């Protein structure tokens, strides 16, 4: 039986086409991936991301615990701020990438990928020491993401809290949004400005309807996983299971900014990640653009002179750039810009070249 989010009963009303996404029945699209993608890039779109996992960490030893488990420096967080971070195994491979929200000195919220909820909770539980209470609240919490240049304008209609003062990666808890108690976070997974909204599961339908109603005149669309993927891909934001995995380190994936090997705490993977940061990793995630006609898909092999040098992690035709592009994890020796490589597309070797990333960056 597939799991469903609290918004599942509303999907049909909005024309959703659902798919099995890691054991969840979720909308791949409502109108079309291209229309939804364009709405987020030019106006705003609303996503149901209630399948994501939420853990609460409480207790006076919370910081020490999180510092041991996370690659980023959790001690630098102040109340009302969020941080992107990763959890690694001792060999540097990635357990998951996640967000850490600091509510108070002894109270944190972790937001993890849906497919990794059980694995992450087990990994964290195994290493709890001291006064730390770890609770999986995933089933109690719904998450909506309103993303795009008009996100603030639309959301502001529904709350008295001044959203214009909220910086990127800041959040406010207990905010009244359309009569619903909400944690409002200026974060996202699209490369655009936007907000991620956390509320009680039973309140999600009210919040969903209110946001779409408030955004009607601005052309805000409900959006599915298809557009979420093309948007995050253009912005070069990693997807666990593709750009990150148990055998891919954050350094290889180009996420060194979230790995603080200089923090005075030993965390899982620190030794190897420090070495890779200082000496370079054997593989590197790069952007590629197809020269020959064809689309590079996840898992396709990448070659130079008949030698396999890596594989494609994500690839598609970019709706914004109208180009066939991809992300590939390849041997660092071949990662310089403009290096010509070949991608095995269904048995044919097609030419591509290494290009700069991100493919898309919003203009302020």
Curated annotation (Swiss-Prot):
SUPFAM superfamilies: Aminomethyltransferase beta-barrel domain, Folate-binding domain. GO terms for cellular component: cytosol; glycine cleavage complex. InterPro entries: GCS_T, GCS_T_bac, GCST_C, GCV_T_N, GcvT/YgfZ/DmdA, GcvT/YgfZ_C, TrmE/GcvT_dom1. Its EC number is 2.1.2.10. The glycine cleavage system is composed of four proteins: P, T, L and H. Belongs to the GcvT family. The glycine cleavage system catalyzes the degradation of glycine. It is an enzyme of class 2 (transferase). The gene is gcvT. This is Aminomethyltransferase. It catalyses: N(6)-[(R)-S(8)-aminomethyldihydrolipoyl]-L-lysyl-[protein] + (6S)-5,6,7,8-tetrahydrofolate = N(6)-[(R)-dihydrolipoyl]-L-lysyl-[protein] + (6R)-5,10-methylene-5,6,7,8-tetrahydrofolate + NH4(+).
